[in-house]
A protein has these predicted regions:
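Intrinsically disordered, low-complexity segments enriched in small residues
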Residues: 3-117, 121-281
Length: 281
């Protein structure tokens, strides 16, 4: 169903359109999408620029929302639990490694604060749709997925997707929305069955693998978040030239760094020796 409340308005076609806010001038709109699955409602909020300067995206922004929103003592898998998806400040920029986003909630595995990062196309696509973060609360009565296509936001039925493997789910959502470039962040059977270490995946190759964020998403009967955006990061930057130069400089540094090949060929396991030497394993 269309997700149209508060600052949203309804088009003649019946879908929800949420107004765009002006960009901040440094590649961020400051727009936050809030979704209440119990009431099947959503609205946008404009983040104060002073707050965004203190918590400029990613882990910092996710932590800010968790501190503000989460009620101590709330069970990680209850409808009142808060799930935050937050982009980094540079996510979507033409800069090496700028494709990261963070998912945060109370961890069902540890009971403590949990967060997990991932790369891939989902984060940049969320930025292109005009959002810095998504805050999800409540629990849908039946399986659903969230569709975000620029200003059009819908909560759609996912009954036919529940129990299916990620490859099938991604293909089915793209077919339903008629767009093969829709980026899908989703849970698998582990998240559906509330396995406390369940992960999230986007593009079938990038994973939020830590702290059981898949179980939190599954507890909300939220199968997936599908995003498609038409804007681009550079359009919201006051002075694009330094960003482009930063991108070139970082690309050279990353290419020449001794860890680059290990990370490219081995993924996160390429950091085992480094983390062990630092006493972080």
């Amino acid at each position: 169903q269309p997700c149209a409340k508060h600052s949203a308005w309804r088009t003649s076609a019946g879908s929800a359109r949420i107004p765009r806010e002006r960009p901040t001038g440094y590649g961020a709109t400051g727009r936050i999408l809030r979704v209440d699955l119990t009431r099947m409602r959503c609205h946008t909020e404009q983040l104060d620029e002073d707050v965004y300067r203190l918590y400029p995206g990613g882990k910092a922004l996710a932590g800010y929302f968790m501190l503000r929103e989460f009620v101590p003592g709330t069970d990680a898998l209850s409808p009142d639990s808060v799930l935050v998806v937050a982009n980094g400040l540079l996510t979507g920029a033409p800069v090496s490694t700028a494709a990261r986003f963070t998912v945060a909630a109370r961890s069902p595995l540890t009971g403590a604060y949990g967060e997990s990062e991932a790369g891939g196309y989902f984060g940049p696509e969320l930025k292109a749709a005009g959002y810095e973060a998504i805050i999800v609360t409540g629990r849908a009565a039946a399986p659903v997925y969230l569709s975000i296509r620029d200003a059009n936001v819908e909560i759609r039925d996912a009954g036919g997707l529940w129990g299916r493997e990620p490859e099938e789910v991604q293909a089915a959502i793209r077919a339903e929305l008629g767009d093969s470039y829709v980026r899908v962040l989703q849970i698998g059977p582990g998240g559906e069955n509330l396995v406390r270490y369940a992960a999230l995946t986007n593009e079938l190759a990038h994973f939020n693998g830590r702290t059981g964020m898949g179980a939190v998403m599954g507890s909300k009967n939220l199968k997936a978040i599908a995003v498609r955006g038409k804007s681009r990061y550079i359009q919201g930057v006051s002075d694009a030239a330094p960003v482009a130069e930063l991108g070139k400089s970082l690309a050279r540094r990353v290419k020449d760094h001794p860890l680059a090949w290990d990370l490219q060929s081995k993924g996160t396991t390429g950091l085992v020796d480094v983390l062990n030497a630092a006493g972080m394993l």
